[in-house]
Amino acid sequence: GPVIQYGSFRHWIYYLAASKNISSQKMGKPNAAICYVLEVYGILRNKRAFLQHGIITADLSFLYYPHTKMSLFVTSTYDEWKYVNDRYGYPEGYVQELGLCRFDQLHDMKVKKNQILIMPTWRMYIRNEISASDHELEAQKFMETDYYRYWDALLKDERLIRYIEENDLQIIFYPHREMHRFLKYFHVDHPKITVASWPEYDVQTLLKESAVLVTDFSSVAMDFAYMKKPLVYYQFDNEKFRQSHHQIGYFDFRKDGFGPVCVTEQEVTDWLIRLHKQGFANEEIYLERHGKYFDLWDTKNCERNYKAIKEM
């Protein structure tokens, strides 16, 4: 369909005139600061639906009702719904368990049995503290971060490289879009390891076609778990992440997660090798957790969202 240029005069006209604003992002507005005042202080009296772009597991205070005044907050599981409904302060009926629209497409996938996807999330403190204006200083500061050192070390792990060579495996490294400006510092020269970026690679396609996922705290783990595929959480900086990015919520990765939690590259490599020797088959304990957590598991997510928005 037709696309309106972001931040343009036309964007403002449509934004102000619309009776309903539907977005997967809280910040999907012509100007975040001005629109915050218009919406939160009741100047703009439209209905706003927050479709979300991932299942919430952490305590995201910026999504509390006093900071959004959204009319519909979409959740995807009972546990997520209960957490948001009980904690975020929304009026009764505003938080609904409908499922992410994109989940409809996750039931139709063709998996590449030899593809390993490494997809970590971003770090707020890295993005905010490292200036992009000075290239040399940016490179120096980024390459001093644990984020760079740990992920770079995993991509260059000799034992992992030897194993993927011997078994014709392929690794795709695609971090969160907020980190793509730093991709140029990951110097990986190997035909079986690809440092991928948008728009050359589509996130949902990578998730659907990959046999196994290595991530950290990213909500893409939920998409992968939804498809009943094996994954591992590489959480080498858990304490700093909780202090500087997102605080812990209802979800305990070790007790509730859909894969093991590792803190060293050796543990990740060990797990990948062991899993491959098992044919990349998911373990029963994680399949059982899938059945308990995803109480909505069908292709009617878009339908439920559509009906809820019409009734909003």
Predicted segments, located by residue:
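Active-site and donor-binding regions of nucleotide-sugar-utilizing enzymes
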Residues: G1-L106
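Structural motif
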Residues: K20, K47, L72, Q115, ...
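Short, charged/polar "capping" segments at the starts of alpha-helices
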Residues: P30-A33, W81-V84, Q105, I126-R127, ...
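A short, gly/pro- and small-residue-rich
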Residues: A33-G54, H135-M143, K229-K240
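Catalytic binding pocket for nucleotide-activated donors in carbohydrate/polymer assembly enzymes
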Residues: P91, F186-H190, F217-Y293
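Donor nucleotide-activated moiety binding/catalytic core segment of transferases
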Residues: R177-M222
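C-terminal alpha-helical cap of glycosyltransferases
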Residues: D298-M312
